[in-house]
A protein has these predicted regions:
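An amphipathic, basic-hydrophobic helix/alpha-beta surface used to engage anionic
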Residues: 10-269
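Exposed, interaction-prone extracellular/peripheral surfaces
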Residues: 155, 186, 190-371
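Hydrophobic alpha-helical transmembrane segments
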Residues: 1-6
Length: 371
């Protein structure tokens, strides 16, 4: 019996030392996002990969990491604890020379840039009576785009913008350069209907002429709250309106630019996107909107518009097409300084468009403010 006890002690000591010295050798873990980009409301996977590239098995090990609490795990999840962040703790058991990969489904519940920075492997020892930790860095991130506001809610503002573009087109298009015919739209003038085409096809068609100015719309996005405290739901809905309106206008072939006092999460600079069109430009706008960090101090919006107006005045003297820009303001804050600056920058517009976002009981809506 004594010899058996001595043998047990010797085996215990040997295994304890062997595992203590070698448990994390050729043992690695990685946690990453399945996508580089997503849109708010999308479901993605968090991928956990653990590799044991040695003969010594690791029968029980915990892999721990933290992630922003906006990522929602499934209702049946029991391996996460939510406080300031979501803390994840998963148990792995690996044989010799084994790789284990798990995919955990999560929902992206808010816009932003999110990063995984570190992972811990925690080993309780060969006999579950010790705690050994191996930390390593992670380099995975995801950009979650804002969910565009519903197209139906943007119908009125779209008609106002297209009406302003048509008004300017008639002031600038060359009636001697016929470009073709197209389907009639609600904002088209009766004088441009091609009656011969209507008689032939039975569908209303309008003449289309070459224009001497571009179709440019600039969205001015103010993220200053009107109240003393940050109305985060209203600010986020304003960003969604900017995304939805950009998507709608770009789909109609309009060049869209965007200027905001919302600052980039890394550069800390105001958000500014020059005019462009197409899917790649919409993705650029989405990326810029996703990168806005509303916790940072913001430039006063009235001052931003005043500086922009001075810049546009100088460009107009230089003959730049920027002088033909149509401005659309998205701002819940309606103080007198903003009103004055808005009146100046939209002085040449027949339709002065100011969208005021609001949120009631979690549901976003908007109305239009007079300038």
């Amino acid at each position: 019996i004594v010899l058996m006890l001595i043998g047990v002690v010797v085996v215990y000591k040997i295994l304890s030392v062997v595992y203590k010295e070698n448990w994390d050798k050729n043992l690695s873990s990685d946690v990453s996002f399945s996508n580089k980009t997503a849109t708010k409301g999308d479901k993605i996977d968090i991928i956990e990969t653990v590799v044991n590239a040695k003969k010594l098995p690791v029968f029980c090990m915990n892999v721990k990491f933290d992630i922003d609490r906006s990522f929602i795990f499934g209702q049946n999840d029991t391996n996460s604890m939510v406080s300031d962040k979501t803390y994840r703790n998963d148990v792995f058991s690996l044989l010799s020379n084994q790789k284990v990969t798990r995919r955990i489904a999560v929902e992206c519940s808010r816009r932003g840039v999110f990063r995984l920075s570190a992972v811990e492997m925690v080993f309780p020892g060969a006999f579950m009576n010790e705690i050994m930790i191996h930390r390593s860095r992670l380099y995975s991130d995801i950009t979650v785009f804002p969910k565009p506001a519903d197209v139906k809610s943007l119908t009125d503002v779209n008609n106002m913008i297209m009406g302003e573009l048509e008004r300017r087109k008639y002031l600038s298009e060359d009636k001697f350069v016929f470009a073709g015919i197209r389907d009639y739209q609600s904002y088209d003038s009766v004088r441009d209907i091609n009656w011969k085409a209507y008689a032939r096809t039975g569908n209303l068609m309008v003449n289309h002429y070459n224009e001497t100015v571009s179709r440019n719309v600039c969205l001015l996005l103010n993220l200053e709250s009107e109240a003393a405290y940050m109305q985060e739901d209203v600010v986020e809905y304003a960003i969604s309106i900017a995304a939805g309106l950009s998507q709608l206008l770009i789909a109609r072939g309009v060049n869209v630019s965007l200027i905001s006092n919302g600052r980039d999460i890394d550069t800390k600079q105001n958000t500014r996107i020059e005019a462009g069109s197409g899917l790649s430009h919409f993705n650029q706008i989405n990326t810029k909107l996703a990168r806005i960090d509303i916790s940072q101090d913001m430039e006063e919006f009235a001052q931003l518009m005043t500086s922009l107006n001075e810049e546009c005045t100088m460009m107009a003297y230089a003959g730049s097409s920027r002088s033909d820009m149509i401005y659309v303001i998205i701002s819940a804050n309606k103080n007198d300084r903003i009103r004055k600056a808005a009146g100046s920058i939209m002085n040449n517009q027949n339709n002065k468009i100011w969208i005021v976002p609001r949120v009631n009981s979690g549901i976003g809506s908007m109305y239009y403010e007079n300038v």
